[in-house]
């Protein structure tokens, strides 16, 4: 699910040239997806990334780089790696972002006009480029943080520390749940991170709490240590209702370099799920999460993971599945980014629908009727296969819910759906004191390192 994301997931649609756009038609036979794919040099030249005809291909697989002179002369600089975007000038040279070859699931990198990877081996992930009068500024996702670097000859120079934009200004008078950083190890020893957000006014000493695990989209996305509020069930929204939230960053996401991102290629939902489950086990073991009041929620790839999780275990009492894939072969055939989906999982063995008879968890399935990224048939298939599920389809909505009334309705349904977890509390529930055994039979013993966040 190749959506372009903010703190959760933003609407992704196949790029189309805007009608009358000033840069449309710069390169005959090709199209420019957006203004962000054109960079202007002070002397009037333009660096342009083009894609093939949007009517036959979204273009992510075969972009090309060009220089267009002021008189309209086009110089072709050759094909660029998949998903090329955001060209900027660096003196008389051009650099841009693209996927690290040769796979379609992996980390973004910075390339020069000769298509050489300038960030190979970097243990973080470039997410944006900004043209300046000198060296370009590279926005870098590094773990839970975001940093700004200057692109230099053979090295990056960091120009800021962690950058956290203030997204909560309109809510300064609203009490928020305490947010903490969580670091732990996967069963195979891989270092992982994530966030824990507690109910408003509570500390970990007040636990165990009902816990909702929020799985991010992508999978090439992440939870950053910033304000967690969105139009889907989100951590601060849940904190207002007495829930703790676990926001894991499993392998496959951004912020940890190319190898970390590429680890789920052809193995979607495998080690990725164990990364998530291990974090839940540790939160139960530390008395933060009530093992009898666990829920899971996600949108897009997170929706797939929520559906996949309840085929792996019966520990969840509620699962919110938003715009998620349930059948990978059908998604590859009917979705608009089939080649990218095939790089993640291409068989029924990766599909929740194959194991739907195992699902005992109640499901709330939500989808946009006009979603072309993940067609609504994915939701309909899962709903038809699971009797204890509710399906909500919003007419006219795409891969993101954009209409205010629909957002309110979605959150109201989610609120009532997850409220059932409060009713499951045992009168004498006590925190677990030993590591919990997950559905796979593993016992996880690595220590948890809790770090206080500056978010609130």
Name each model-derived stretch.
Residues 49, 214, 321:
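Redox-cofactor binding/interface segments in oxidoreductases and associated redox assembly factors
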Residues 211, 239-249, 390:
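A fold-wide structural signal in alpha/beta-hydrolase
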Residues 211-213, 364:
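Conserved beta-strand elements of the Class I
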Residues 214-215, 272:
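A structured, mid-to-C-terminal "fold-capping" secondary-structure block
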Residues 215-217, 367:
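The conserved beta1-alpha1 loop
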Residues 218-219, 371:
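Short glycine-rich anion-binding loops that position phosphate/pyrophosphate groups of nucleotides
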């Amino acid at each position: 699910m190749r959506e372009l994301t903010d703190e959760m997931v933003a609407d992704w649609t196949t790029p189309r040239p805007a009608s009358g756009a000033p840069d449309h038609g710069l390169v005959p036979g090709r199209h420019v997806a957006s203004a962000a794919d054109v960079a202007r040099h002070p002397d009037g030249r333009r660096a342009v990334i083009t894609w093939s005809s949007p009517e036959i291909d979204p273009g992510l697989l075969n972009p090309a780089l060009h220089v267009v002179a002021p008189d309209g002369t086009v110089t072709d600089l050759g094909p660029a790696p998949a998903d090329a975007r955001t060209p900027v000038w660096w003196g008389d040279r051009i650099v841009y972002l693209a996927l690290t070859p040769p796979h379609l699931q992996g980390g973004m990198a910075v390339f020069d006009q000769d298509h050489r990877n300038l960030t190979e081996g970097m243990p973080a992930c470039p997410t944006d480029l900004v043209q300046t009068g000198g060296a370009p500024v590279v926005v870098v996702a590094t773990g839970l943080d975001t940093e700004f670097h200057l692109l230099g000859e053979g090295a990056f120079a960091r120009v800021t520390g962690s950058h956290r934009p203030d997204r909560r200004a309109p809510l300064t008078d609203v009490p928020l749940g305490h947010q903490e950083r969580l670091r732990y190890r996967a069963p195979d020893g891989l270092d992982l991170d994530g966030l824990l957000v507690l109910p408003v006014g509570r500390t970990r000493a007040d636990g165990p709490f009902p816990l909702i695990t929020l799985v991010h989209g992508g999978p090439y996305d992440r939870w950053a240590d910033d304000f967690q509020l969105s139009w889907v069930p989100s951590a601060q929204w849940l904190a207002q209702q007495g829930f703790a939230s676990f926001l894991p960053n499993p392998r496959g996401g951004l912020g940890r370099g190319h190898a970390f991102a590429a680890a789920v290629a052809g193995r979607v939902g495998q080690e990725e799920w164990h990364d998530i489950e291990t974090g839940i086990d540790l939160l139960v073991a530390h008395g933060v999460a009530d093992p009898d009041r666990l829920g899971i929620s996600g949108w897009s790839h997170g929706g797939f993971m929520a559906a996949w999780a309840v085929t792996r275990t019966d520990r969840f009492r509620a699962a919110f599945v938003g715009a998620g894939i349930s059948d990978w072969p059908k998604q590859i055939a009917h979705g608009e980014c089939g080649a990218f989906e095939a790089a993640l999982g291409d068989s029924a063995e990766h599909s929740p629908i194959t194991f739907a008879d195992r699902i005992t968890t109640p499901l709330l399935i939500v989808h946009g009727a006009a979603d072309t990224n993940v067609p609504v048939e994915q939701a309909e298939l899962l709903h038809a296969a699971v009797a204890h599920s509710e399906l909500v389809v919003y007419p006219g909505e795409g891969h993101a819910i954009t209409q205010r009334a629909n957002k309110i309705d979605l959150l109201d349904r989610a609120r009532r759906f997850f409220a059932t977890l409060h009713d499951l509390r045992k009168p004498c529930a006590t925190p677990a004191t030993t590591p919990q055994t997950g559905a796979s039979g593993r016992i996880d013993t690595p220590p948890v390192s809790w770090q206080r966040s500056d978010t609130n």
